[in-house]
Design a protein with these regions (language model features):
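Residues lining the SAM
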Residues: 148, 363-366
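A conserved mid-domain beta-alpha-beta active-site/ligand-binding segment of alpha/beta enzyme cores
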Residues: 188, 193-219
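Short, flexible loop segments at boundaries between secondary-structure elements
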Residues: 172-189
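Short "lid" loop at the C-terminus of a central beta-strand within the Rossmann-like core
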Residues: 73-76, 181-182, 396-400
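Active-site beta-strand->loop->alpha-helix modules in alpha/beta enzyme cores, enriched
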Residues: 2-177, 211, 227, 236, ...
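A short acidic, Gly/Pro-enriched loop at the edge of an enzyme's catalytic core
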Residues: 353-360
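Conserved N-terminal segment of class I S-adenosyl-L-methionine
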Residues: 2-37, 111, 235, 240-292, ...
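Class I (Rossmann-like) S-adenosyl-L-methionine-dependent methyltransferase catalytic domain
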Residues: 253-292, 296-353, 369-383, 390-439
Length: 439
């Protein structure tokens, strides 16, 4: 378990000191859509969501938003030396408190506790990302995702924030982060003021937040008079969350999602390219090409270069690209003897290569894009085709864990462009299309 950078039982920055600091800064209001959507709230532990964003949860509920709350852990590690409460009992108590708190902020909201180990959320990052992606789904642009600040000073908070940032990048959800422990350990110099967003809280919203905070009794009151059962959030700490406003951070910089690069670093052949399934799929892919020879091909998402080797036999020139530097290195090694092949690192659609191609191959990569990114790839790939060019699509038809799109949805996005379908192949495990350039 990674230790926090602070001690909750040591003196910290006072609420009055922060009041002075905040008064000296003109802060940008938090802009909420005029039409109610979905609010997905992530906490590392029960009470994070109430302390950091209880006011916003209440505001959204009043406005008719669909509110969903997920706590990564049950917070069973809050009192490690308690003589009266085991970790199992604390988990049970805190789950119940979470339900009660959210009922006071957003009656009817869905509440989920994943039960990841308290203090070790970072060790379960992929699991948390996958859960959030599944919650958000394919309509991420309608979702406001709230999560702990990635620089909050507590490892569980920072891991939960990172998981939410990755999930937002994969789904196109809007990410807004809330600080909790910053108010205890931080100071004016530690705040990225350009990212700060302010939400004023009226009396009714503040009262609901205070009531929800009180519902987390195991944290705001002693468990018992015995040593080890002391109050976790004492009055000076709670004072930070009694303000008539809440502050959030909104960072426009995209998070680095290196999951696919990690897959390639951990395994030299992550997709088992010599398996019977992969060999069969490549054979069908090559047999589906309407022409024997192409002048200039582009393969998007080449991975370690297995398909690139085969496509090179059909292309005078082939440019193969992948977002993973590790994959690019492996693909260059695999195609080293093929002078007509160039392998380049590029993340599409942002780094789409220039030029026109009479063959564009997009195979087993579309579902690793967010819906917005996929729309960009559809546009760029069709625009890059020569008049007689072909767009080859081939994707596993099942749902990949941790991403919102499956193969059939990827193909539907391309088919919706109106591009003529020249070849269609439906396999139990994959779907293949060859499209022409739209008229």
């Amino acid at each position: 378990m990674t230790r926090p950078v602070f001690r909750h039982d040591r003196p910290g920055t006072s609420a009055s000191a922060w009041t002075t600091v905040l008064a000296a800064h003109a802060m940008v209001p938090l802009q909420l859509p005029s039409v109610a959507g979905r609010l997905v709230v992530v906490g590392a532990h029960p009470d994070d969501e109430t302390l950091g964003a209880g006011g916003l949860i209440r505001v959204a509920a009043i406005a008719g938003w669909q509110v969903e709350v997920v706590s990564a852990t049950a917070g069973e590690g809050s009192h490690p030396r308690s003589p009266t409460h085991s970790r199992e009992l604390l988990a049970q108590v805190r789950r119940h408190e979470l339900d009660q708190a959210i009922a006071r902020l957003a009656p009817g909201a869905a509440v989920t506790c994943l039960g990841l180990p308290d203090g070790a959320v970072a060790d379960h990052l992929a699991e948390l990302v996958a859960h959030l992606v599944a919650m958000i789904g394919i309509d991420g642009e309608d979702v406001l995702l709230l999560a702990p600040w990635r620089r909050d000073g507590h490892p569980d908070h920072e891991a939960a924030g990172l998981a939410a940032a990755i999930a937002a990048a994969r789904t196109d959800a809007r990410l807004v982060e809330y600080p909790v422990w910053l108010w205890h350990w931080g100071d004016e110099q530690g705040v990225p003021w350009a990212q700060v967003r302010e939400l004023p809280l009226d009396d009714e919203v503040r009262a609901a937040k205070m009531s929800a905070t009180a519902a987390h009794a195991s944290q705001v009151e002693p468990l018992s008079p015995a040593p080890g059962d002391e109050v976790l959030l004492d009055a000076p700490l709670r004072a930070h969350f009694r303000r008539d406003l809440e502050l959030f951070f909104e960072d426009d910089e995209p998070v680095r999602d290196d999951a696919l690069d990690l897959v390639h670093r951990e395994r030299s052949d992550p997709w088992q390219v010599e398996s019977d399934y992969e060999r069969h799929k490549r054979a069908v892919t090559l047999a589906s090409l309407p022409r024997q020879r192409y002048e200039h091909g582009l393969e998007v998402g080449c991975s370690i270069g297995a398909l690139a080797v085969d496509l090179a036999q059909r292309c005078g020139r082939l440019l193969a690209v992948d977002a993973s530097e590790t994959a690019v290195t492996a693909a260059r090694e695999r195609t080293a003897g093929l002078d007509q092949v160039e392998v380049r690192r590029a993340a599409v659609p942002a780094q789409w290569p220039s030029g026109r191609f009479d063959l564009v191959s997009i195979s087993e990569v579309g579902y690793f894009l967010s819906p917005r990114q996929l729309a960009g790839v559809v546009e760029r790939s069709l625009a890059a085709l020569t008049e007689d060019g072909h767009l080859l699509l081939c994707h596993w038809r099942h749902q990949p864990v941790g991403w919102p799109l499956a193969g059939p949805a990827v193909h539907e996005a391309f088919l919706a462009s109106g591009a003529p379908v020249l070849v269609e192949h439906q396999d139990p495990d994959f779907v293949l299309h060859v499209l022409g350039r739209p008229a």
